[in-house]
Amino acid sequence: IAPHRWTERYEELRMRTENFVAKTGANVKIFLANMGPIPQHKARADFVTSFMQVAAFEVMTNNVFPTVEEAVKAALESGADATIVCSTDATYPELAPAVTKGIKAVNPEMKVFLAGAPSAELKEICDAAGMDDYISVKSNCYETLLRMQKERGMF
């Protein structure tokens, strides 16, 4: 059995991004659509920020968005590769599908993720709106980030 560090795969993710940025000047850009007051989105925004920064992706932090329209407009103007909707389970049924539809109507290539593990009912609603994925403690961090690197052309 060859010895190895358990962190090697994650180090490779980070190095791949750093090398790509050095070579192209471009990185995977993640826009956070933080909905509602700070206590409503902070925990999930912090979690997905750390999740994405494992691969050295650029996370675009921002102020809160009181309306879906403001969040959609800012996400589209950001030039991000992906938007992550951050809020609470109680507000997601109203907010998440609307943000997703608003983004996808103008830029169907932008990925839209939900911060958190949705209920079966919420997942059905969000999937129908075009939500691309869900990021929570149940997510496979390595596989998610690797897939995003592949989609960005880092391989």
Spans of features found by a protein language model:
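Non-catalytic terminal/interface segments that mediate subunit docking, oligomerization
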Residues: 1-87, 91
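Extracytoplasmic/secreted cell-surface and envelope-processing proteins
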Residues: 93-95
